């Protein structure tokens, strides 16, 4: 038995928010993650009253918020864009704290192999600022794994001297995108994992990778979950389903799959 909690990505249901909240509870989720980068959940579109109303809806269904998704789709590799992206990211973190979670997941762009290159330094500067702000709120910007091997990301994070920028661990992304070992990657990033996505996938050639239901891909779940337990992780495995025609069914099956592994 493992101490993990099961979450669901609210947007994966592809339904209006109230209906998606109902489904999240019905399938057996304990928590949820929701995109906060656009639409009605973006910080600029949510008054304090609306934020409280949303949180009340979450709690009334027996759920909590595991994290917000704050991926703005551009990374932090362009010094001309970074000031605006950093400012918006801070507002999303403010929203997260008001919604009683301390994690905002994001993508920063692919960490270069060469620590001496300009892009590496640009990303460092952006992440230093994000980390400092997150530390002030006792919160985390959590970088999603996948664009680079786990060890390279760990080395980058070590240069920041902070857990304000931490990790949202996605085993499928590592497996599909860079052919990394999901279990070994957990040990490489053990100091930084604050949230995880539960997703599975297979490497291939056409297309280069494909998402599949949990347990049907290349993620070795028993080894992966054991590794998370061994590093002391006690947080959320948040189910993210980005494709397929029957998201509710797929998410419910994923909940059952995880329950069978951790209960």
Language-model features, listed with the residues they occupy:
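N-terminal pre-domain/capping segments
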Residues: 1-97, 101, 162, 191, ...
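Active-site acidic/histidine proton-transfer and metal-coordination neighborhood
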Residues: 16-22, 57-60, 74-167, 176, ...
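Hydrophobic residues within beta-strands of alpha/beta enzymes
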Residues: 32-33, 66, 104, 196, ...
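Short secondary-structure boundary segments
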Residues: 36, 108, 200, 241
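H/E-rich (His + Asp/Glu) clusters that bind or coordinate divalent metals
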Residues: 217-219, 223-224, 229, 235-237
């Amino acid at each position: 038995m493992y101490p993990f909690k099961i979450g669901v990505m609210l947007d994966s249901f592809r339904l209006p928010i109230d209906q998606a909240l109902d489904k999240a509870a019905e399938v057996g989720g304990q928590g949820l993650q929701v995109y906060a980068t656009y639409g009605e959940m973006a910080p600029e579109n949510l008054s304090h009253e609306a934020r409280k109303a949303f949180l009340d809806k979450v709690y009334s269904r027996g759920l909590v918020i595991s994290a917000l998704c704050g991926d703005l789709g551009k990374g932090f590799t362009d010094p001309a864009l970074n000031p605006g992206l950093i400012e918006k990211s801070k507002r999303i973190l403010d929203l997260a704290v008001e919604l009683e979670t301390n994690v905002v997941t994001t993508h920063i762009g692919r960490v270069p192999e060469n620590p001496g290159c300009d892009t590496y330094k640009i990303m460092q500067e952006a992440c230093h600022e994000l980390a400092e702000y997150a530390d002030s709120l006792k919160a985390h910007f959590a970088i999603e794994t996948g664009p680079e091997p786990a060890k390279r990301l760990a080395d980058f994070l070590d240069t920041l001297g902070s857990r304000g920028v931490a990790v949202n661990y996605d085993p499928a992304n590592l497996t599909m995108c860079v052919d990394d070992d999901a279990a070994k990657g957990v040990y490489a990033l053990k100091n930084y994992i604050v949230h995880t996505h539960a997703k599975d996938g297979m490497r291939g050639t056409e297309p280069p990778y494909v998402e599949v239901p949990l347990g049907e891909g290349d993620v070795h779940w028993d080894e992966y979950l054991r590794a998370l337990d061994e590093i002391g992780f006690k947080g959320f495995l948040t189910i993210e389903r980005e494709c397929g025609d029957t998201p509710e069914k797929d998410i419910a099956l994923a909940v059952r799959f995880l329950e069978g592994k951790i209960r």
